[in-house]
Design a protein with these regions (language model features):
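"…together with the soluble PPM/PP2C metallo-phosphatase catalytic core" -> "…together
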Residues: 1-189, 195-202, 287
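C-terminal membrane-associated helical module and adjoining short loops/tails
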Residues: 161-301
């Protein structure tokens, strides 16, 4: 994954490569799981037990799920990135959340799995802490895609081999929101530029939303509908007829970073990073609440 990140930094890989290569890179991980565990049976949530029973063997679908999880984790941090301290900061919060969860579960039935996770997470946390010190605003070290892919795959490995992949996904709540919000651009339903970073205004010293500009007629009916619905719910800002002939439309790039700027207005980079990391902390608090309270509605704990 480090090599993939380096290749992306140097070669600017297309999105289809970013999906294909992590899938291939996850094969050794899936082989380790198959050789050492091989368990593909899940506990069915309470609302579905009358139809599916208490347990259900997913077979190969479980490996498909784990492969998709590895691809998501690898790219999740990479698409919520681009301002000083955000990549290392969100990785720190997620790692701290996983460590806390592992410590809580040490007295449970899966002690060895959580000790295994701690062997990875504790060194990762402290090395990332040192990186964050130099990566925070004003940054003296830049992480690039190399760190993002490495961090994401590290989380995927401990989540899969530590048998807490569902809980680990809960620690990715901001990344899931960012992914869902970004889907129209990631699937090119709405034109997606190579970089979707916020725009720096040298006059104010603040970051502003960046925009995607495209011909209005080039947008598909589905893209037009998504844009209209998103605009109605104030999720995007749309400027129509931005040229003298009225042929072009602009909309803000669909990232969580731009959405926060849309809500709060132009923001200093240090403040913006702090707000996004605060969202990550709030997401982890929600994750623990779901894991230890709301879970009772779906499972016997």
């Amino acid at each position: 994954m480090i090599f993939l990140g380096f290749a992306d930094d140097v070669l600017n890989l297309r999105w289809r490569h970013k999906l294909l290569l992590p899938t291939m890179a996850s094969l050794p991980l899936l082989m380790v799981y198959f050789t050492n565990f091989g368990n593909t049976t899940i506990v069915v949530p309470k609302p579905f037990r009358m139809f599916l029973g208490l347990h259900m063997n997913l077979g190969i679908l479980y490996y498909v799920y784990m492969g998709m999880l590895a691809v998501f984790c690898t790219n999740a941090i990479n698409i919520l990135a681009g301002i000083n301290g955000l990549e290392a900061g969100q990785s720190l919060v997620i790692a701290a959340s996983i460590i806390t969860f592992n410590m809580i579960e040490l007295n449970g039935d899966c002690r060895d799995d959580h000790i295994f996770s701690l062997y990875f997470m504790i060194p990762f946390f402290f090395t990332t802490l040192g990186l964050f010190y130099h990566n925070r605003y004003p940054s003296r070290a830049f992480v690039g895609d190399t760190f993002c892919y490495f961090a994401g795959m590290t989380f995927a490995v401990v989540g899969i081999l530590g048998h807490f992949s569902k809980t680990m996904l809960l620690f990715f709540i901001p990344q899931v929101v960012n992914f869902i919000y970004s889907l129209p651009q990631l699937f090119h339903i709405i034109p997606c530029p190579r970089h979707r970073l916020p725009r720096f205004n040298p006059d104010t010293g603040k970051l502003e939303m960046s925009y995607s500009r495209f011909k209005s007629k080039s947008l598909s009916p589905l893209g037009t509908s998504i844009l209209q619905v998103s605009e109605k719910f104030h999720l995007v800002e749309v400027h129509r007829g931005t040229d003298k002939d009225g042929e072009y439309t602009e909309c803000n790039n669909m990232t969580l970073i731009n959405l926060v700027i849309k809500i709060l207005g132009p923001t200093h980079e240090r403040t913006l990073t702090s707000l996004l990391l605060l969202l990550q902390v709030v997401g982890s608090i929600m994750a623990f609440s779901i894991r230890y309270q709301l879970v009772r509605l779906f499972y016997d704990v």
